[in-house]
């Protein structure tokens, strides 16, 4: 029981989860989400009497997409690269997706009948993302924040990316976003700009290379463009590796055979 509450201000906060349909409206103009409070306004009632409502409180929400293109280091698009998306650096909390008409859509776990990352199984419709004949993987319905894109299988003949790619989606909203009034219109003005970055770490020919990229974005469509490059895997191993030792021994053996044959001919 609270004492001396008369005249005090009460602040209520709420959280909501977007359903799968949010993936259909990435970028501007965004969409309205509304909430209001129903309360008892009958002092003589224990909650079963007359009720009233607060005015609607409205927030403009946005979702985003990542347009991925898989290529080799000569800009040839690659089919058959497999990816999974995670919300943590250790790649334990997967962001599940399902196949849609225009790409891979983030799944609302409740509506899909699955469970979250608490030891249960993945949602019913969850799939692994695979680059098509055009090399594309379109990922739709993301919230702002940081994600890790992990390649789980490289195209045939190419090296698998050793580390996941860290992707950040960074929107900038108007300062008075929380003062939006339901039905006000001009929801697109709420999103001022959209930025996205990618940190890519690769290991090739014995050297580690790290790159921080500023991705091309379009706030109207709510998308960021990311090119993921695979290099051919059949390169001579670095000095000191077991594979090189085998090659050197084999090469020396071939030379010995060649010398023996030459001596026999003499």
Language model features with spans:
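Solvent-exposed loop/turn and edge beta-strand elements of beta-rich ligand-binding domains
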Residues: 1-266
């Amino acid at each position: 029981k609270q004492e001396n509450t008369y005249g005090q201000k009460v602040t209520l906060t709420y959280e909501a989860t977007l359903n799968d349909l949010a993936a259909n409206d990435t970028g501007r103009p965004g969409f309205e989400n509304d909430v209001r409070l129903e309360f008892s306004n009958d002092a003589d009632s224990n909650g079963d009497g007359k009720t009233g409502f607060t005015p609607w409180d409205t927030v403009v929400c946005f979702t985003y997409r990542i347009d991925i293109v898989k290529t080799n280091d000569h800009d040839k698009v690659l089919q058959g690269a497999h990816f999974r998306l995670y919300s943590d650096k250790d790649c334990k909390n997967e962001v599940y997706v399902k196949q849609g008409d225009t790409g891979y859509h983030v799944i609302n776990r409740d509506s899909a009948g699955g469970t979250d990352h608490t030891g249960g199984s993945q949602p019913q419709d969850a799939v692994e993302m695979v680059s098509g004949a055009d090399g594309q993987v379109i990922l739709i319905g993301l919230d702002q924040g940081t994600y890790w894109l992990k390649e789980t299988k490289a195209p045939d003949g190419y090296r698998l990316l050793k580390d996941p790619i860290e992707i950040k989606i960074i929107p900038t909203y108007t300062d008075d976003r929380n003062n939006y009034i339901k039905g006000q219109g001009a929801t697109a003005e709420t999103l001022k700009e959209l930025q996205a970055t990618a940190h890519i770490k690769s290991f090739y020919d014995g050297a580690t290379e790290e790159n921080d990229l500023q991705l091309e974005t379009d706030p109207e469509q709510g998308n960021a463009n990311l090119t993921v490059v695979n290099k051919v895997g059949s390169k001579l191993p670095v000095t000191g590796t077991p594979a090189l030792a085998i090659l050197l021994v084999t090469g020396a053996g071939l030379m010995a055979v060649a010398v023996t044959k030459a001596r026999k001919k003499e």
